Amino acid sequence: MSTIVFSHVFFSYGTLPVLTNVSFTCGPADRLVVVGPNGIGKSTLLALAAGRLQPDSGTIAGPALSATQLVPPIHRPAATWSAPGVPLASHPPLAGDRESRTVAQLIDAATSGTRELAARFDFLTEHLARDPSPRDEAEYDRVLAAMITRDAWTIDTRLEQTLEALDLGGLDRSRPLASLSPGQRARLRLALTLVDRPEALVLDEPTNHLDTDGREHLAHTIDDWQGPVLMTSHDRAFIERTATALLDLDPTPWRAVAISQGEPADFGAYRVGGSYSDYLRDKAAARSRHTAIHADQQAEKRRLVSHQRDSTVVGHARFKPRTEIRMAQKYYADRAQTVSTRRINDDSRRLSVLAAREVPKPRYDEGAVSFPRVIRTTTGGTSPHPHAMGIALAVRGASVEGRLAPTSFEVRYGEHLLVAGPNGSGKTTLLEWIARGAPSGAHGCVDAASGVVLVPQVLPRPGDPLIPENAWYLGIGEAGKGFVPPAAWNRPLGELSAGNQRRAQLAFAARADAQILMIDEPTNYLDLNALESLEETMREWEGTLVISTHDEWLITRWWGHLHRLDERR
């Protein structure tokens, strides 16, 4: 069976180190999820695993770098790789989309390897019946094994079932790829990746654009996969459901524990077995140990330095010996010098041992997200929450033909509401109506307090009302405090990573004097650490909050009111 093995892998883009001394194994039964902050190198690691990039040093073994001609003369890599948010098989027929191609042409190209394999199998079967030879029999055995691995006999059935499960069953196959939405294209490529049955499955954010049924189908497929699965995801419920282990590319707390114990600590990734919940507990415990170790070490360091300083003085500094003991002064001075020197040397040795195992200061709060506790209104006074009474938002029979089924609810000042519903149920339509007014074809009534601020689900663009114009040229400045790392404050907004652009949106929204703060898909683009931090600060925030999300992890742990939209429109 296939196994992906990284051994002391280093990789950089030019002079910028990305991966440093990364080692791990992903075996046939592993569903290994790579996690870490935005920009740390998760997608780069997947590209290395699929053979699309070569490491600076170290070795990578596995299907992507093993013999790609499993069944001559059929040429196809044995692994599959998916670009961020756009699952994409790595074999040549899918390498790069041509917008003029149709859905049918893409499907034909993606399944051509399996169909060629089946044709080769039929040819060998007939040929061996007429003129058998040891060479042909050996090839027949290899082809048969590959047919079984790929389940080639059921490719048409599996194709239809997978397209249906990913909400593509009714897709017109004569349509050009350019006419598909980004979500449709992403789901189509994911479907073709799964149908192709590579030896190893390598996926980057595979649940993007999937509804609940699609995520469940993908989870079942991964459970049943005959081979290693290596992937990244920010979908915590999906990770909880599928992962057998997580690989953290930010091993800071585990390094600190290793340093304190005198063990090697130059590893660039740390593996935690089990589910996402197991990972959270392990990471929290490691961070707690790191914090406690640092505090104990600093206290011991201060004690040793103080003792070393005091050891230079024996007795009382202002004491003058009496006449009768002056004769012994040299004797006592020599003895004091010996004691002092021994104490100083002992302290120096202890300080050297401590320095060898001294851990860096924990800085786990620096990447945290935090809303201001007091929000001011545009008139200069404090906002109505948390003390004001009454209704901040009332929705009465609101509907939009073909986009939003009739819905009604109320939100009082200081309350938190989560709007849930399947893809296409109108979550975004509803939030945009509340923030910007009724769209064409709207019916019913929406009455909201003045000062509604909406963070859209997409990344910011020039001209967005939430973003000051100068942020695109000068950066977000101190407005990013509590959201964006200080090193990114003075960089133009468009140069920031997707995760930091999302943080910037949240930062401006939190400081926008909002009577009602609305966030459409708050978990989009954020890494797992940021997601956990954002949830904590939203939970503690005293303002009026309305969010929409498909994040099942957040929905099942939601602390406020929950309103589900009807799929019928």
Predicted regions and their residues:
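Flexible nucleotide-interacting loop at or near the entrance of a catalytic core
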Residues: 132, 138-164, 169, 287-403
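ABC ATP-binding cassette signature C-motif
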Residues: 1-289, 377-569
